[in-house]
Amino acid sequence: MIFGKGVFGARIHGGQMPLRVIQFSTGNVGRHSLRSIIQRPDLELVGVHANSSDKVGRDAAELCGLAEPTGVVATDDLDALVALRADCVVYTSQAETRPDVALKEITAFLSAGTNVVGTSLVWLVYPPHADAWLRDPLAAACAEGGTTMYVNGIDPGFSGDLLPLAALSLTERAESILVQEICDYGSYDDAEFTGVSFGFGTTPDIVPTLFLPGVLASIWGGPVQLLADELGVVVDEMRERHETWTAVDTIECTMMTVAPGEVAAVRFAVEGIVDGRPAIVMEHVNRLTSAAAPEWPVPPEGRPGVHRVVINGTPGIEINTHVGNDHTDHNEAGVIATAAKAVNAIAAVCAAPPGLISLRDLPVSQVRGLMR
């Protein structure tokens, strides 16, 4: 270990200097976290990683839509970024389809003394649930560098951990928990990953990645297990279910064009079975147009999307959360929220004990510096 958490501890806790941060990738999520890092007085951008050659050498401000140059230019040199010995790297590069590469990149930072806050490798939203092939090398890197890694977002993440825990704090008894994302994805520009993973624009006989046995549980089973551990109950089994809805007419949307007979909506869930009943359920209902699958659950008040928690208990509780406003599309707002969840956690992660952590290991409040 060259620089571990202890080296930067006095500076972090003394408040004399901003935390030095690297942004890794500038795609859908990364451009928003990059902008947030630049604009926050408690953070100092010291490096930016870009995957595409057309972004290398460009100023960070240009890559996230800001006018005033930062003097920090994007690079694809991993070793140079690791050598900066930053306090934290915000890792938003798409990793689920390239986990081996992502592991190499992330472990390089962790081993060298740089903490990691991420929005990808979503299996790590609750590390105890993650498979050993992923968890073990990262944990070893944390031990070597004296560093911490935290992965979260809006879903998986906020909607399946912080939101239901807030609702549960108001109950005296909970019989079941339902967490839902119900969203029109039509304006979401992510055909290459979300489109392919969900099977949008394919015929129902083609099984998308998400619906392969075990994949849903590997992702949303983490939040199920986190809630079970918080509640002190044992999940006997995790069940997966999924179904599709095909278009009747041609659908034109930002993500793609869907022909009649092709998948335009999906509904899937992971059910945590406790004492023989589905007690903790994570469900998605995602459409490429609000007119698709009218028989499935829809957001309230005609909204395009909702993250919802329903507690069946004493008392019963339902919380509906919506992102976006008159100036920001709900899908774009969801991406901004995902980026914010990572950036807002930087200080807490830098102050946390070394290792792979989840929401359970961090303070509830991570909002300092937001009102400006």
Name these PLM-found stretches.
Residues 24-25, 168-296, 305-309, 332:
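Active-site-lining helix/loop region of Rossmann-like oxidoreductase modules
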Residues 103-104, 112, 120-147:
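Rossmann-fold NAD(P)-binding glycine/threonine-rich loop
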Residues 290-291, 298-372:
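C-terminal helical cap and adjacent loop that interface with cofactors, partners, or active-site loops
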Residues 2-112, 232:
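N-terminal glycine-/serine-/threonine-rich beta1-alpha1-beta2 phosphate-ribose binding loop
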Residues 51, 95, 114, 120-124, ...:
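Short, ordered loop/turn segments at secondary-structure junctions
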Residues 158-169:
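Alpha-helical support elements that line or immediately flank enzyme active sites
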Residues 24, 28, 32, 84, ...:
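Conserved active-site and cofactor/substrate-binding residues in soluble primary-metabolism enzymes
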Residues 45, 116, 148-149:
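Hydrophobic beta-strand scaffold residues
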